[in-house]
Amino acid sequence: MLPAFMSLRHFTTTTMRRAASEFRMPVPWGELRGQVWGPSHGRPVLCLHGWADNSGTFNTLVPLLPNDWRFVAIDFPGHGLSSHRPDGCFYAFPFYVADVRRVVEALQWKRFSIIGHSMGGNVAGMFSALYPEMVESVVLLDTYGFLPTEVTDMFTNMRKGINDQIQYDNMANERKERVYTYEKAKERLKVANPYLSDQSADILLERAVREVDGGFVFTRDFRINLKNIIYINIDQCLHVLSQVKAKVMLLLAKDGLFKTFTLPDGYADRICKSWTDQKATFVEVEGDHHVHLNNPEAVSSVITDFLQPQSPDQTESQSGNQTSRL
């Protein structure tokens, strides 16, 4: 069983101050980092951030959720403070699913819930289909849980992803880290993420940059920007979705991701119909793609209500989990 280590840290939100422990877990290429809130025996909830974000995306939401639950929010590899994947490796989507499997094995969680934002919600969807016996409930924050691709685009994207990766590797010795002032780093982050408030940008930057001589550099691996090389089409997506046994809520922002990012014609309707067939819950809230970070009060109560055990007698000890040593 892999050990993991935690150190105490604090953060401040507009609503309250709450202690978080720093999560550290060894993996073959380095370590996974993240944050932990709540008692080790608490009801387990895994929090998965979106692409190019980090576990800080949950820093304002978790303090509004039950304080006797156990929340573990990880930085995916190549994000936040986690190690980058080894040289020459791709950031292919299934690897993120495997990362989750590593984490819950180390935590000794046999059954748990997931809150996933954007890409993290897609990871949650795939994990829940592959390991339906492990996942009790899933909250999908501004995502449909799956991102199918047109068959005609799959191989074009694969070719581009392979070529870009090889080109990146060939230029590795020529590449230098760009150093920013804090304000310039914040400006760059907000240009890439126009939904973020000033406070939200500062929160993400706690784990998104590190200080060096002369300023700050971004911690994330540039390779996360390269094309994914593994996709599923709509028919595969709907089949995989049908394997999910967890209780699912799609918590969508009125001015969220799908106002600017559109799926191919008819895909969203087909995915939503499949979720409806699975008896998923749909909730729309006022806000943008990062509403859970910018305005957590808009989503905290509905998340708490949804994740509450279905039976008052259902406790963490009945889930089959061992009390985590991590």
UniProtKB/Swiss-Prot annotation:
The entry's active site is 118
GO molecular function (one) = hydrolase activity
- Give one Pfam family, short name only: Abhydrolase_1
* Enzyme type, top EC level: hydrolase
Q: Domain of life, per the record?
A: Eukaryota
The record's disulfide annotation reads: none
Q: Which family does it belong to?
A: Belongs to the AB hydrolase superfamily.
Q: So what does this one do?
A: Probable serine hydrolase.
Q: What is the protein's name according to its record?
A: Serine hydrolase-like protein
Q: Which organism is it from?
A: Danio rerio (Zebrafish)
**Source gene?**
serhl
